[in-house]
Amino acid sequence: MAIFQGPHAYVSPGWYENHPAVPTWNYAVVHAHGRARMMDEAELHDLVIRLSDSYEAGREKPWRAAQLPGPFVNAMLQAITGFVIEVERLEGKFKLSQNRPAEVPRVIAALEAAGEAELAALMRNHPPPAKG
């Protein structure tokens, strides 16, 4: 299983208008279940080159791994572990204060004030479903 953690942050009960309340943690996460295998050296090298080329594309002076001495590249690759996972099942979970829909705007504002803009945006874009 591989875990992909999205934005997450502490939520203070002091942010709520309604009490009693306790602290909690809001988060977004995906668990990818499947068979994993380690990449061999050639696969890893190819992947790093393709990723670098992709991110460098369109730059005025794109950096190329070919500019580096082979021994340096090989030493850097030793510090990277590459794996491939054949995904059989994905499990995603969002805990975004859905149990307190009236408090969500206050939590979003407090998260933004605390510098947690990514989580605040996720909550704004995925509001709790309306009751009814």
Task: Describe the residue ranges of each PLM region.
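C-terminal edge-of-domain segments
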Residues: 38-132
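Short, structured beta-strand-loop surface elements
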Residues: 1-47
